[in-house]
Structures are given as C-alpha cells and as structure tokens.
Amino acid sequence: MKTTIKQAKDHLNQDVTIGAWLTNKRSSGKIAFLQLRDGTGFMQGVVVKSEVDEEVFKLAKEITQESSLYVTGTITEDNRSDLGYEMQVKSIEVISEAHDYPITPKNHGTEFLMDHRHLWLRSKKQHAVMKIRNEVIRATYEFFNKDGFTKVDPPILTASAPEGTSELFLTKYFDQDAFLSQSGQLYLEAAAMAHGKVFSFGPTFRAEKSKTRRHLIEFWMIEGEMAFTNHAESLEIQEQYVTHVVKSVLENCKLELKILERDTSKLEKVATPFPRISYDDAIEFLKAEGFDDIEWGEDFGAPHETAIANHYDLPVFITNYPTKIKPFYMQPNPENEETVLCADLIAPEGYGEIIGGSERVDDLELLEQRVKEHGLDEEAYSYYLDLRRYGSVPHCGFGLGLERTVAWISGVEHVRETAPFPRLLNRLYP
C-alpha cells in the first residue's frame, strides 16, 4: 500500500510503501537509520541487518544524500520521535541516485545557501517555515471568506501608483510606460464600491534599496478594503484577522514551530484588543526612553518601532501619523488635521510593521486637492476620483505583508527565509 509520511500514522503495524528522499543517514555494523522526507513530513526508517536481505542493508549504508527512493516497511510506534512513529524498513528501491549533493549536514554560510536556495528549501527548518507560510495563507482565506469578503485580483501592471512612483519598477507596455504594482489598493477601493468588502492576495514590488532583515524587493501582500467602515471598525477587523491567523498556526503547525524552536508562549498571548498608541504619545514615549534622534513629523525607524513593541510585548497599533509623511489618500483626523486616520500594526520582538491601513478620503474636492499637493497626474487617477463622484461612502483598507508576518510567527531572524525564492537588493537568482 502506497502512502505518505503524514498519513503513515493511520497504518500502524501495517506494511506500506513511501516515495521519499534521503536527507541523512547513519549506520553501525548491525543497524542503519535513514532520515526520510516526502514533502508531507520527515520520518526515520530503521534497517536492521539481521531482518533484511544482505543487498538491502548494503544499499542502506551506501545510498547517497538526496537520492530518491521507494521505501517499503512496517510502521511502528516510536515515542522518541516527533511524529510518534517510524518505519521498520524491509526493502529499498532507488529511483534516482544523487551525486555530490552540495548542501551537506555541515554548516554553510548564508550566501552559499541562498545561491542554492532551490536545494536549501529541502532542509527541515526551511520546510517548516514554508508550511507555516502555507497555513497563514490558508487561514487568511478562511477568515475573509467567513466574514463575507469577496476576493478580487487587481492588476500587476499599472499606469498609476497609490504612493507615487519613486519606488516603482518601470517597464514598457508596448508604446506606454507601466509600473509593477506596489499595491492593489486603488483597484480594491473600486471593487469595494461594487462588493462592499473585498480582499486580494498577490505579489507587490518595491524598488527600495534596502538591505535590512525586514525588506524584500518582491513580497506578497494581503489587502482588504471595506465600504461603510470607519477607522475604529477597520482596526477591529485587522486585529481579529491577525489573531485568527496566529491561532491557526498554533493549532495546525505545532511540529513546525517545535522544529524552529519557536517560543510559542509569546504567540499564545496574542488576543484582541491590541494595544493602541497615538503617534504623538509614541514620540513622547521614545523621548522618555532616551531616543533623541526622532522629532514630531518624522517617520519611525526600526529601533523606534522595536522599542514601542517591546514595551507592550504584543502587536501594537501606532495611530494617527502626521499628514505630511503619509500618502495622499488618507482621511484627515477630525480631532487634529495635521494627522490622518491611519495605523501601522507593529509586531513584537523586533519584526516591525506588518500592517499599514487607513480610512480613505471620501470627499472629491479634498482628494483632488491632495492629488495636486502631491504633484500627481490627475488624469492618471481619473478613475480613482470617479469613485468619489458616484456614490462615495466612508471606507477603509489595509495591507498585511505576508513575509514579515511569517517571519514573526515562525521566529526566523531574516525575512528572506519566509519566501521560497526571495528577491533581494543583490539577488535575482535562483
């Protein structure tokens, strides 16, 4: 009977065949231990010399790392294993023998591993990170579908940009200039006027020359837009969404979190409502903490965000940033028109901003004024202005960076490990 490592628990004391790769092995004169993986998990295969044909044991000792195999044997309980079971191997069939696999069990430098990213993905920890990424995506769809959102797919090639063109990749669209999208927001706002609540999930591109552990050139973003929704209501949706995702990973990725040695007690504390601190109060807090490199009207850097998040040791909303450091489409704060109705959600443990969101300007005259103030081409935004001409309503939206969120939840140090094939300032291969 053919099965998988994940399903093998349903076949205790039965003989099964599993297609797998050999990740590692060790042997003595009488027994060989094969570390097997098949994409669904990792399992140990035990080959006892006295219980198999001589050729099988010889093969078990000689087979090379990352060779592909069909392994047949009996599934037995093993309380020492993370899985709780292992295979007593009876026969081995080699599908393809691997020669001189470059990523050996010894330590390798990061650049070497990134050069071999197509192979590094096979390692136990990288496999665990990708499984957590997959669970975050699954939980995202679950949350939005249950909450009545409609999925919309905005274009990747665009003629205009929600935040200006200075950090966009320019390309040719036949005889026109086009940009790789940095956000689907403007299109989602249009879709929200048709469907009420919408979300998207797709790649975004930022031509930022950043080399920090938080930045990728290409990353995936989950964006939501909600009609008839105010800023406070939007924050509630955001914190409910993040809490749902964290709980889903805790429930469905226990083994992966253990492999990554993640301190799950920090994740277990994540619950609504999240703390909120205004930009004004955050400035005062930072100055009291000894930060003399930040003044009102300046954006926060990584050390500032980390200090604020560490104070709460939870995801925290920083609200109502100054108008002059935020994009043109954000609604003024009626209590202080030098600020806007926006919030950044800062993850704890130094992972930085994972969500940016705001209430959107819904008044046509004000939006036209903002477009001019930011030096944007009004014609390029004519469709966006139309949304305020024909039945404008209060509405809000937000975007969550998938890779940063996965980095925080999984506890990995650098965001590059949370994308299958990350695009960095100095890396376009593989």
Swiss-Prot record:
Main location: cytoplasm
Signal peptide span: none
Entry's localization field: Cytoplasm
Gene3D superfamilies: Bira Bifunctional Protein, Domain 2 (3.30.930.10), Nucleic acid-binding proteins (2.40.50.140)
Enzyme class: ligase
Family: Belongs to the class-II aminoacyl-tRNA synthetase family.
InterPro entries with a match to the protein in the record: Aa-tRNA-synt_II, aa-tRNA-synth_II, aa-tRNA-synth_II/BPL/LPL, Asn-tRNA-ligase, Asp/Asn-tRNA-synth_IIb, NA-bd_OB-fold, NA-bd_OB_tRNA
EC number: 6.1.1.22
Catalytic activity line of the entry: tRNA(Asn) + L-asparagine + ATP = L-asparaginyl-tRNA(Asn) + AMP + diphosphate + H(+)
Subunit structure: Homodimer.
Domain of life, source organism: Bacteria
Originating gene: asnS
Stated name of the protein: Asparagine--tRNA ligase
Annotated Pfam families: tRNA-synt_2, tRNA_anti-codon
MF annotations from Gene Ontology: asparagine-tRNA ligase activity; ATP binding; catalytic activity, acting on a protein; nucleic acid binding; transferase activity
Organism: Staphylococcus aureus (strain bovine RF122 / ET3-1)
Classification via PROSITE patterns: AA_TRNA_LIGASE_II (PS50862)
Keywords: Aminoacyl-tRNA synthetase, ATP-binding, Cytoplasm, Ligase, Nucleotide-binding, Protein biosynthesis
Record's GO cellular component terms: cytoplasm
HAMAP family assigned to the protein according to its UniProt record, in alphabetical order: Asn_tRNA_synth
One BP annotation, GO: asparaginyl-tRNA aminoacylation
